[in-house]
Amino acid sequence: MIAGHFGFAALVKSRERQVPLWALMLAAAWLDIVFVPFFMTGVERLQTAPGTHGGYGNGIIYADYTHSFVGMLVLAAILAAICLPIWGRRSAIVIGLVAASHWVLDLLVHRADMPILPGNLAHLPRLGFGLWRFSWLSAAIESALVLLGAWAYWIAARSASMNAKQKPRLAAAVAILIATFGILILYLDVSS
């Protein structure tokens, strides 16, 4: 799930106008952004699930630090702390919660590959409901998040534009971009 994270960020933006959209998009992808250096150094890894050819939902992700429950809490708190002096307490909390939402949304689709503790300390059971096994359902949920987020963003931004006596075309253009890029990302992910 990547497109769904961005759809959720747009949905949050529709309710939290003081937080920049780009900051919410960054927060939604924060765990994956931090995953990249861990992956590049071999600390975390990806593996094709047995009996599959890879592609959408057919990977086992060993992101034992960035995608552990406790790791998510730490990373969300770090991002919120970075944002606190820039946008204030409320916005920092919102950004931290959006970063944490990444883990919750991943929990729905991931196989049981998400540990509770960083490094899978104590070897507790890994979590994940595995909706990726049903790629059509997973893709439908992501599509719904993208479209709902784009629609909610458009409604809120259009209303704000009209209240400020601005032309609401920019709001429509951004909403269309959110929906288009979200669906395109999902299509590329599913068709890989």
Give short role names for the model-derived ranges.
Residues M1-S192:
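N-terminal membrane-targeting hydrophobic helices
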